Design a protein with these regions (language model features):
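Conserved positions within compact, well-structured domain cores
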Residues: 1-143
Length: 143
């Protein structure tokens, strides 16, 4: 996989532009503006705490489904997306793995292209900020 521009990635064996990161508007919808957004996402410790991160359920899902998700094997059947708490990277050092994560958006800062938007989560606290694109954050690719 390699990065081709601010929001597009190429995965080996697939056409360029097939994979991308979500935009600022798409992340905003998932995390904040859709109906019951705060009930359709939750910090979870799955598989007896082995996998920690944010679970995001699809639209129109009964929020009670969240309590039944206790392992990674439950994710596909519920249509959920799991964002691991992968920490962040500064230089070659990974910090806070298992407790926080930051995920890049495909939207650069309008005023300064060396910055881009990213989502930060710790437990159930989710926020959005802008940071230097050279900093190490995770990406969630979609088709």
């Amino acid at each position: 996989m390699f990065f081709t521009n601010s929001s597009s990635f190429q995965v080996a064996g697939e056409a360029a532009g097939t994979w991308r990161t979500l935009s600022n508007d798409e992340w905003g919808y998932l995390l904040n503006t859709r109906t019951d957004a705060s009930f359709l996402r939750a910090w979870k410790e799955l598989d007896s705490g082995e996998h920690k991160g944010l679970v995001i359920l699809p639209d129109d899902t009964d929020a009670s489904v969240m309590s039944g998700i206790t392992s990674t094997s439950h994710l596909a059947s519920s249509g959920a997306v799991f964002l691991p708490a992968a920490g962040d990277r500064v230089g070659t050092v990974v910090n806070n793995a298992g407790s926080i994560s930051r995920y890049w958006f495909g939207t650069p800062n309008e005023g300064d292209g060396s910055y881009a938007y990213r989502m930060y989560f710790f437990s159930n606290d989710v926020s959005v900020n802008c940071d230097l694109r050279e900093r190490g954050s995770s990406v969630r690719l979609v088709r």
